[in-house]
């Protein structure tokens, strides 16, 4: 048994039901739909990924702070498809990490008679930072513009 504040909370079920009770996250790790039929509810291609992620990104954006980091896991084409929506909802791209799973990942998954392309042995994990924005007189200002505005105002 541990004492002190709880360091994590595990929710079992649909995360869309859990967001309303989320505290402001420091780090979000998303390992959702890839567009490869990986689980019940995943899309069958990159088509539909933006619609699948849109409500999640909206919740992340609403509850996060300017210091929140997002690690977005997916396939190369899946991430490239969702990236514009992340940007539109206030997330700034930082870097991409490519996970090379190696040859053992394809063992048993490749048939020499039917293979027509290189087997997929990578995933991407893309780091985003929540964009710092301040609303002033109906306009959204980044940190530099806001500091300049405050300096001129004072």
Task: For the regions a language model picked out, list residue spans one by one.
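Core catalytic lobe of class I
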Residues: 2-154
């Amino acid at each position: 048994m541990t004492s002190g504040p709880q360091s994590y909370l595990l929710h079992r079920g649909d995360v869309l039901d859990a967001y309303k009770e989320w505290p402001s996250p420091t780090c979000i790790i998303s390992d959702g739909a890839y567009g490869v039929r990986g689980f019940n509810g995943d899309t069958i291609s990159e088509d539909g990924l933006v619609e699948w992620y849109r409500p999640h990104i909206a919740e992340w954006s609403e509850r996060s702070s300017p210091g929140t980091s997002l690690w977005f896991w997916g396939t190369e084409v899946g991430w490239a498809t969702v990236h514009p929506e992340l940007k539109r909802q206030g997330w700034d791209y930082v870097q991409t990490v490519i996970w090379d799973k190696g040859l053992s990942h394809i063992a048993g998954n490749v048939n020499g008679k039917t293979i027509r392309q290189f087997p997929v042995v990578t995933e991407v994990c893309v780091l985003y930072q929540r964009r710092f924005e301040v609303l002033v007189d109906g306009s959204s200002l980044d940190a530099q513009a806001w500091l300049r505005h405050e300096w001129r105002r004072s």
